[in-house]
Amino acid sequence: FFGWLIKGAIHAGKAIHGLIHRRRH
């Protein structure tokens, strides 16, 4: 469960980072 939580957090972080990068670009 903990590993899944971290994996989910990383995925969410990448998604948010991608959205921010797209908005800036």
Curated annotation (Swiss-Prot):
Gene Ontology process terms (BP): defense response; defense response to Gram-negative bacterium; defense response to Gram-positive bacterium; hemolysis in another organism
Keywords associated with the record: Amidation, Antibiotic, Antimicrobial, Cytolysis, Hemolysis, Secreted
Reported function: Has hemolytic activity against human red blood cells. Seems to disrupt the membranes by adopting an alpha helical conformation. May play a significant role in innate host defense.
Native species: Pagrus major (Red sea bream)
Keyword Amino-acid biosynthesis included in the entry's annotation: no
Zinc-finger among keywords: no
Histidine amide modifications at: H25
Gene Ontology CC terms, in alphabetical order: extracellular region
Family according to the record: Belongs to the pleurocidin family.
Localization: Secreted
Expression across tissues: Gill. Localized in certain epithelial cells lining the surface of secondary lamellae and eosinophilic granule cell-like cells at the base of secondary lamellae.
Protein name: Chrysophsin-1
